[in-house]
Amino acid sequence: MAKKGVNKQARTNSKLDQLVTSLERLTVGSMQRKSNRQRPKSRKTSGRVVTAPVSSAALIRYKAPSLNGNSMDSVRLASKSLVIEAVKVGIEYQVSVVPLVPCIQHTWLSGVACYWSKYRWRSCRLVYIPYCSSSFTGYVSMGLSYDYADAIPSDETEMSALKGYTTTSAWAGSEGIKMLSYPTGAVPSGAVVLSLDCASMSKPWYPYISAVAATNLGEKQPELLNQYTPARAFIGTGGGMQGVNGLTAGRVFMVYDIELIEPVSPAMQENLSSTGRSKIDQSISPLTGADFEIVRKVSAISQIQ
């Protein structure tokens, strides 16, 4: 009888040991899971370092413009236009000016917008596309001015104070090529883009103005251009090679979504007399406005009737 009592006590102690071991395992596992849940997650940073590629190339394919019209009185377009064919970078600081108007010469948009009386930008973005090597020295910066009475920035300090200011090495930004095929899409990471704030315009609609009339007006009374366009873009370059002033680094495209209303004859839009000079001021030679350098390549103005 005494031996049976000893065996029974041993079995009881063994079961208690097993129970204690199981409880210890459960406690340790619970603490580990709780520790994992409380471990802080890593946060994403907003900064981004761009590494110079060993080799890269820009491939741009044709994509037909998107055209939508709800009635005979309006049309909506989404496409791209080349507005600066050669962005030049040198040792000296240089600034190019791009007026954000649909009448920029040598663009498909200018040939369509002249048939409409008013316009508004739904989206308007300038995209810098480099085609220089990664060893190219210099930088490109962009900014917006919403008042034509303001002077053109003379250095990078003044440029950096503008709305939408962005700057990068002259070889960076090839990711923006995707935007040329999808003008209303999201901005790819790494793209060098200047975006117009279309939600904060001073007017709901802007009257169309021809390139020649805008040039003449910009020469004599630039502040009046606020009636015809919401803003102008500045593209600044500098920091190039010592002793070199004017190496081509890339191009600037405008990708846009624009709405045009109130159809009108193009002849009424040009504001030109039979001599081909602007009716605003025929004493001013066309294509000399400092604010409209991009249209200086226009020729044969006298042929426009």
UniProtKB/Swiss-Prot annotation:
Residues 34-46 have a biased composition (Basic residues). The keyword tRNA processing does not apply. GO terms for cellular component: T=3 icosahedral viral capsid. One of its GO terms (molecular function) is structural molecule activity. InterPro entries: Capsid_prot_S-dom_vir, Viral_coat. It holds the Pfam family Viral_coat. Gene3D superfamilies: 2.60.120.20. It is found in: Virion. The keyword Transcription does not apply. Residues 30-49 are annotated as: Disordered. Its main location: virion. SUPFAM superfamilies: Positive stranded ssRNA viruses. Keywords: Capsid protein, T=3 icosahedral capsid protein, Virion. Capsid protein self-assembles to form an icosahedral capsid about 34 nm in diameter. The capsid encapsulates the genomic RNA (Potential). Belongs to the icosahedral plant coat protein family. This is Capsid protein. It comes from Poinsettia latent virus (isolate Euphorbia pulcherrima/Germany/Siepen/2005) (PnLV). The lineage of its organism: Viruses, Riboviria, Orthornavirae, Pisuviricota, Pisoniviricetes.
